[in-house]
Each structure stands twice: as structure tokens, then as C-alpha cells.
Regions:
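A short, structured N-terminal alpha-helical element that caps or precedes a catalytic domain
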Residues: 1-117
Length: 117
């Protein structure tokens, strides 16, 4: 393995090993906790199938996943602390679509006075 990392050997090797560790952690979460998990693309498959929103809609009707619970907990804490009148949600990638809708769903249900855009 030592020859594969060139003159930046230690740093490159550390990055490589950290990436392998994170990939294994992600695989564990997908298999045991939330099948839609991804570090940079949570539920990306649902966003990519957006020619029909049926599958996405069905997932939004399900119970919160463990990852959803963490996201909603943080969102609730921020909403109560900041007390915004308007929340803007950006969806730059398909992997952001599910979480954006899940957050919007939570805000609409629990903070009807907050405008969403």
C-alpha cells in the first residue's frame, strides 16, 4: 500500500483510510438503520425518480426514520430559537429533495405561521 500514495504518502494514505472507514460506516447505516442514507446524497434515488412524485410522497407518509428524527430535532431547535417568519429551502441536488420535503412537511404541520419558499 505504501507505494500507491506518492510523495504525499502519509497524508494521502490517511485520507484514503478515512474514506474507507466512512464508506463502511455508511454501508452499516444503510443496512441497519436507514436504506436511504448517504453522506452527501440522502434519499437521492427518490429525487432522481422525480418524473413522478408518487414514491417520494409515499416515503413522506411513512414514520420518521432515525436520520429524519435527527434532522427534525435540529430543525425544531433552530425554529424555536430563531423564530423565523420565512424559511427558504434550497434543493441544489436530487439527494437533497427528500430531506427538503420532510423539513417542509414538519414546518407546515408544527409552525403554520412560518412561510415556506
Amino acid at each position: 500500500m505504501e507505494f500507491a500514495f506518492g510523495s504525499m504518502g502519509m497524508q494521502d494514505k490517511a485520507k484514503h483510510l478515512a474514506t474507507l472507514y466512512l464508506e463502511d460506516l455508511s454501508d452499516f447505516i444503510v443496512e441497519c438503520i436507514d436504506e436511504n442514507f448517504g453522506f452527501s446524497r440522502y434519499a437521492e434515488r427518490l429525487g432522481r425518480s422525480a418524473n413522478s412524485f408518487d414514491e417520494l410522497y409515499n416515503h413522506l407518509q411513512n414514520e420518521l426514520t432515525f436520520i429524519d428524527e435527527i434532522t427534525i430535532k435540529i430543525l425544531k431547535e433552530r425554529a424555536e430559537k430563531v423564530q423565523p417568519k420565512l424559511v427558504l429551502i434550497s434543493v441544489p441536488f436530487p439527494g437533497n429533495l427528500y430531506s427538503a420535503f420532510r423539513c417542509a412537511q414538519f414546518i407546515k404541520a408544527n409552525y403554520p405561521n412560518i412561510k415556506l419558499s
